[in-house]
């Protein structure tokens, strides 16, 4: 989640059960440390030819976490069905990487409204807040014991999801013509974990983009919930898992002992059930560079550049 430059690599798409390049499981020491240098002006500050921006502030119910949400609206008129809309976690880092070149590319299709949900900080990541907000309570150990220098409180995904769906989304969508059939959610690492948990727990969104979800940080039990899904409850939702093939010297796959078999079983069951899930492989990208590549791909997908999903539990897309 950490490299600040865009990557131009396009993913090779495969059905979700292809395991050859699946590297979801990681230990803390194998994650590159985040680039925590303070951020400068972003595209909202500089201005765009293709989008206009607004910023809204929110607080958590307990008053301990404070959010800054950027809403980017296309300068083009909304289609009759409304704009697609993509909610993006780690919004500070997203806004730091968003540029007019990508916005131009989106505008050539059906440009989405972009909602970057970040925190009230000048840093790219609020490490403590995201560790709490993005991790599921059911699988939580209350603190992130794999965090190295920190022991971060975890397990707040239900509270954050309620904030996102009942306060943030209604506020930012007010007055906009939104296509609710094309409302999506993207997240990377812990954010990817939140997206996967949200796919299981909520039908507020239709498209769920989970990039490099941190299943290996003690959250692999989430796979049991995935395995148990009833397909009829997921017919209207679409899940895309995005992962990079391990680069040379990246030995994350060596930590997958005892877990890869669970993933294999889970993905096979999903395939057999005909659930609308896909796996997108990004060759030669590690965990950090997947932040840029995956959020770009999610935006392009929801804008309609890539093949559209089709409803129906037995029609696998892509």
Predicted feature locations:
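Short glycine-enriched nucleophile-adjacent loop
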Residues: 192-201
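A domain-start/cap signature at the N-terminus of enzymes
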Residues: 28-83
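Alpha/beta-hydrolase-fold serine-hydrolase catalytic core, especially in secreted/extracellular enzymes
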Residues: 273-275, 284, 293, 305-318
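Serine-hydrolase catalytic machinery in alpha/beta-hydrolase-like enzymes
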Residues: 82-163, 167, 171
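Alpha/beta-hydrolase fold nucleophile elbow
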Residues: 177-188
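N-terminal signal peptide c-region/cleavage motif recognized by signal peptidases
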Residues: 23-27
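A conserved short beta-strand
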Residues: 204-214
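The feature captures the conserved acid-bearing segment of alpha/beta-hydrolase catalytic domains
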Residues: 216-281, 285
């Amino acid at each position: 989640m950490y490299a600040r430059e865009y990557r131009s690599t396009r993913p090779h798409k495969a059905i979700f059960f292809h395991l050859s390049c699946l590297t979801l499981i990681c230990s803390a020491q194998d994650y590159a440390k985040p680039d925590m240098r303070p951020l400068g002006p972003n595209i909202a500050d500089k201005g765009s030819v293709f989008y206009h921006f607004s910023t809204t502030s929110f607080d958590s119910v307990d008053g301990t976490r404070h959010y800054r949400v950027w809403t980017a609206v296309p300068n083009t008129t909304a289609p009759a069905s409304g704009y697609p809309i993509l909610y993006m976690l780690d919004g500070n880092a997203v806004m730091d990487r968003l540029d007019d070149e990508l916005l131009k590319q989106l505008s050539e299709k059906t440009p989405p409204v972009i909602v970057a949900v970040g925190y009230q900080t000048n840093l790219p990541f609020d490490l403590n807040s995201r560790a709490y907000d993005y991790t599921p309570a059911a699988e939580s150990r209350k603190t992130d014991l794999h965090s190295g220098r920190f022991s971060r409180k975890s397990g707040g995904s239900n509270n954050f999801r309620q904030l996102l769906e009942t306060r943030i989304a209604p506020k930012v969508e007010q007055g906009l013509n939104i296509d609710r059939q094309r409302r999506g959610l993207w997240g990377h690492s812990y954010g990817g974990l939140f997206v996967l948990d949200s796919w299981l727990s909520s039908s507020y969104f239709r498209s769920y983009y989970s990039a490099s979800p941190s299943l290996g940080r003690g959250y692999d039990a989430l796979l049991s919930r995935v395995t148990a899904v009833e397909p009829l409850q997921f017919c209207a939702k679409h899940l895309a898992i995005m992962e990079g093939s391990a680069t040379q010297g990246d030995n994350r796959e060596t930590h997958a002992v005892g877990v890869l078999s669970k993933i294999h079983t889970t993905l096979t069951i999903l395939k057999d059930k005909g659930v609308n899930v896909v796996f997108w492989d990004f060759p030669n990208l590690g965990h950090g560079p997947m932040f840029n590549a995956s959020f770009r791909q999610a935006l392009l997908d929801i804008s309609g550049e890539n093949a559209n999903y089709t409803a129906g539990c037995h029609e696998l897309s892509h």
